[in-house]
Amino acid sequence: MSVIKLDHVSYVYSKGTPFEKVAVNDVNVEIEKGEFVGVIGHTGSGKSTLVQHLNALLQPTSGKVYIDGEDMWADPKQVRKFRFKVGLVFQYPEYQLFEETIYKDVAFGPTNMGLSEQEVDERVRHATAMVGIDSADLEKSPFELSGGQKRRVAIAGVMAMRPEVLVLDEPTAGLDPMGRELILGQIREYHRETGSTILLVSHSMEDIANYAGKALVMNDGSLYMYDDVEKVFSHQKAIAEMGLSVPQVARIFTRLAEKGYPVNPNVFRVEDAVAQIRELIRKGENLHV
């Protein structure tokens, strides 16, 4: 069953003015419940604008957005409930922190859902533990934390609402490799534990290959492709023409295949590449890329 359906969705900035710009153009897609979807596209492709439609931050200029089969904008007075169903983490979410303690910041969303004090407490402690925040630190000011820790607190605040869909727009932007791996690992663990649908907007093809099951490709405001990650990245030439690149592992294996080595060129994850290289070595192949 699809948890998200976009039906001919378009969005135009500054419509009717000299600055009018089509940011999203006639997008049709259905995303199944429980999928982990990577959203990719060049800068200005419309990917961030697209995902802002999913929790009603933006209303389509035309077309409809369905969540769990319900037309999000059929009754504007009911839009608020979709913001609890679809959690959105912006780029640099640490700039959205505002409460005096970590606990209060993470509790803000669940409290506004009308949950009991006991339920809010359970959710805060569970979400912060999931992102690696020690319970002893919950009464600290979030502004005393490092950039990476602040980001984890901000993500925990959305996770604590337990949305059916969690949308993250470049959640690792500006982090060092260790910080990036930590946050992505926590998002994957959340996905495994809750079964929620995840949409991860990222410019890193390696991250999409390693964490997502499907990829949604935006190009100049239009949906170019939505399919399994392996199938999307097999279109290496088309992706390159959009100004994107496939994971480095894929480029290496494409060169190996071109040189006549018996490899599958459509390899995108390091662990799969290691397995193939070991098999080649076992067969006595001498690799020169």
Region spans (language model):
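Helix-to-loop junction immediately C-terminal to a conserved catalytic motif
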Residues: 55
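Conserved ABC ATPase "signature" region
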Residues: 118-136
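Conserved catalytic motifs of ABC-family nucleotide-binding domains
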Residues: 162
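Catalytic Walker B motif of ABC-type/P-loop ATPase nucleotide-binding domains
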Residues: 166-169
